[in-house]
Amino acid sequence: MWKKVAMVALFFMISALLSMPGGAVEKDYGKHPWVVNIEDMTVKNEYFRAAKWTGQYLQMTVMSLKPGEEIGLEKHDQGDQFIRVEKGNARVVMGLSKDKMTFDKKVSDDWAIFIPSGFWHNIINEGDKPLKVYVIYAPPEHPAGTLHRTSKESEAVHGH
């Protein structure tokens, strides 16, 4: 009898954890084969940044930016970056100098952004709803398992 009660309780606890914002996004599945519905996972994510898969040469994170929030002006000298907008409206700016952004485009659902190594860039949520994106870095940019619940938490770690 008690075993049955314990199993039911365990089932409900696991269900509750998986139904939390973003589903169990705290886990990084890297270094193991993994298959995922990337759109569903990205749209459900409510954290500013969560590393979902970190391998030796590649990393995938999901991000959620509140209206008016931005990723922050940054540059990666050691690798390229790919960003896909799953949901929302954003402005993308890029340039070889942080003082001279020569690339300025508006993007929305289903758009892809390719950022070459050495380019300063920023993504700004210009919509009135959260911007949901996934990001692929080659090589990895963040430590495996990185989780930034808010942009302020990310700024404290990265300075942007």
Predicted regions mapped to residue ranges:
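Glycine- and acidic-residue-biased ligand/ion/polar-headgroup-sensing regions
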Residues: 78-91, 95-96
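Histidine-centered metal-chelating micro-motifs
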Residues: 70-72, 91, 111-113, 117-123
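Ligand-binding loop in jelly-roll beta-barrel domains
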Residues: 109, 117-143
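A generic "binding-loop/recognition-motif" signal
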Residues: 58, 67, 78, 119-120, ...
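Sec-dependent N-terminal signal peptides
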Residues: 5-13
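Short acidic-glycine-tyrosine-enriched beta hairpin
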Residues: 97-117
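Short hydrophobic/aromatic-rich beta-strand segments that constitute the beta-sheet cores
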Residues: 60-62, 92-94, 133
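A short, N-terminal "cap"/entry segment at the start of jelly-roll beta-barrel domains
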Residues: 2-6, 18-61, 72, 104-109, ...
